[in-house]
Amino acid sequence: MAPVAYRANSRWSLAWLSPDGQKLLLTRVLRTFAYGYLAVVLALYLEQLGLDGFQIGLVLTGALAGSALMNIFWSIEADHFGRRRTVAIMAVLMALGGLAFALTDNFWTLLLGALTGTISVSNSEVGPFLTVEQAVLPQTAADERRTWLFSLYDMLGSFGGAAGALFAGIVGVFASLGLHGADMYRPLFVLYAAIGVLNLVVFMRLSDRVEMARVEGKRKFLGIHRSKATVAKLSVLFGMDAFAGGLVVQSLVAYWFHLRWGLSPEVLAVIFFAANVVAGLSFLGVGPLATRIGLLNTMVATHLPSNVLLMLVPLAPAAWLAVALYLLRLSTSQMDVPTRKSYSMAVVDADERTATAGITNTARTIASAFSPVLSGFAFGVAALGVPFFVAGGVKIAYDGLIYATFRKVRPPEEELRVQSRLTRQAAARP
């Protein structure tokens, strides 16, 4: 489907965005609200159920592995099965996963619930929802708005996550009402299931325009034809970054603050509310910066300093300083997310977008699936700072490699700007 018409003077009214695009923004906010509070309480809940650090890491790894398996399947089948039906099925699985966590104390049942691929271990998502929505969004606005749309998508997601993180403090209210131990967390998982149902309702109201137009000809391997080399390189590099990120997902960072400094769920709720607000506000600068220096340069320039700050967090001698360094890191660390999505959608053909989103997100999820169990092991042997040091170092290496690999590969709109500038310069010569 062609993108909707671009309206230059209606940025904040969302008149430039199709109704389907607006619905996807709504589902994003609903999910990230749930992810936001789950990121704060998930590891604490599992600890209350009697799981040790290694078992907690296994459940989180199971969640990421389930997301990867779903991504592998749906990145191949979503365009043929139907994008709307795909996300509807995932919404049902989200509801079932939430109920599984709410109703059981059994480790193996929890692991099975995690394998639905819809239990998030951070306020962000890399599963099938993201794969389909990332492919659909460029169809809901003009190319000139693509990067801003992804920035808005991620900004609203961060604000949803912030609200969810703050909402996690409600466990204190549940405790005052007589719920104790694991029971004071269970209502949040019931709410998680309800949010899955709300997503289902919205997804069923999407129009046929979200579907990929049928393309004549032989079906290509994994949905990729012209861009195989590009997608392969992106997948390897994104996987490298995600492995490092998986060592310090928000669930584990919240657990680290709890272990290292003894912070309560109520305090953690405020910290991660602030963290998500800071990350959300940072997205406002992505569009102007990317327009000025380019998508790839924006990815690297904002990501690199945040990784240095990440390595400083465990070195802080006081809790307040560790929190301050973590928040300062988030002021730039997420700015590469919308630029990464926009860039990967721009450098492939339109009929490759779902497959590209699925393959790169699957690579990220598989790579990150190995990380939480390693962090859980490190926490179990009191090596609390190691995940931060390893994550920061690997991410710095990723920044250098992605710049070296793709510095000469420009999205179409950047090529047009370069050509326009060269034309003006040529016309100005005597």
What name fits each language-model region?
Residues 85-100, 297-312:
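Structural signature of the two symmetry-related core transmembrane helices
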Residues 168, 172, 193-213, 398-406:
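C-terminal membrane-cytosol helix-exit motif in multi-pass small-molecule transporters
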